[in-house]
Amino acid sequence: MQGSVSSLEIIILAAGQGRRMASAKPKVLHTLAGRPLLTHVLDTAMALAPRAIHVVYGHGGERVPAAFPEASADWVLQAEQRGTGDAVRCALPRLADDALTLVLLGDVPLITPGTLKTLCARAADGIALLTFEAHYENQYGRIVRDDQGRVERIVEWRDADAAQRALREVNSGVLAAPAAHLRRWIPRLSATNAQGELYLTDIIALAVADGVPVATASPGDPTEVWGVNSRADLAVLERAFQERQAAMLMAVGVQLMDPRRLDVRGQLIAGRDVQIDVNCVFEGRVELADDVRVGAHCVIRDSRIARGARIEAHTVIDGADVGPDCVVGPFARLRPGTVLGGHARRDDRVQR
């Protein structure tokens, strides 16, 4: 059945240059929590178990797909960046006729599977938009509704008049619609607008004209739909991501001496009654068993720390296995391949 989970195909738009990043690197390759922005979006897409993932790339050329050699994705080149509508047009031939198509943005890394499942459920045989209320200055496209509250169209900021810019409901850029509808609407898009581009958002007015229902959904947390357009944006999202990690750790019994001073740049698996002091960095896959204590200013990378171990302040552990009830540090360094048996002690005089 059209719109069922089994028919889901995802398009990720990742072709943009990101001029405000002031970088030679494609925007989606900039890192959040130690991983490229696009990696976060790919992981979320995979969590939905789609039939296919199509990534539209352009700026930076083959550097983008080359950075993800293990990704289960269909890479689609947008040779000339002519807008989001053109990006989806490039991917249209790859979609199955019965596909429910979910369009994601490669520079919006904090979107969650739960929010996207809700959005897809509301698409049915129509179209569903992810919108949110923005009570701060921004340049998102505005959602225009009629007197009965039905969505009429989306007006991009540069094309909006003063009254439209005053609207608070804005477009996140994420939407879901059957591929059959997209094939009908995309060829009808026009570049007659302030940016001279094909706006994907213009399909909303076409849907309304065709009598196709337009539904909306909202994220549980506004940070889910915040995008990265500058280094400042990236810094804000980095903190939002780390706050989310801190909340999840505390929910499973970890004591953080200051949740605002924690950096998880990979996967941190922690048992109960773990205590982590301030300014610690965890990279790659790190496992902390029950009752582990980690002192301030430690860096732990791709390591396992067994039950009851104590890692004192200013210690660096890289690719090591630390046994139960060990004491490491302060100011110690364990190099890759180090294995410490139970109750061992290593201080600042030892670098393994």
Where are these regions (language model features)?
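Short beta-strand/turn micro-motifs composed of small residues
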Residues: 14, 57, 105, 131-132
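Catalytic cores of nucleotide-enabled group-transfer and carboxylate-activating enzymes in metabolic
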Residues: 8-9, 42, 50-52, 92, ...
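Short glycine-enriched, charge-decorated loop/helix-capping segments at active-site entrances
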Residues: 25-31, 189-192
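Conserved alpha/beta core of the MobA/IspD/sugar-nucleotide pyrophosphorylase nucleotidyltransferase superfamily
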Residues: 6, 168-271
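Conserved core of the sugar-phosphate nucleotidyltransferase
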Residues: 62, 111-195, 201, 212, ...
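N-terminal nucleotide-binding beta1-loop-alpha1 segment
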Residues: 1-23
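Left-handed beta-helix
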Residues: 258, 265-266, 271-272, 277-278, ...
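Conserved N-terminal catalytic core of the sugar/cofactor nucleotidyltransferase
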Residues: 1-9, 35-121
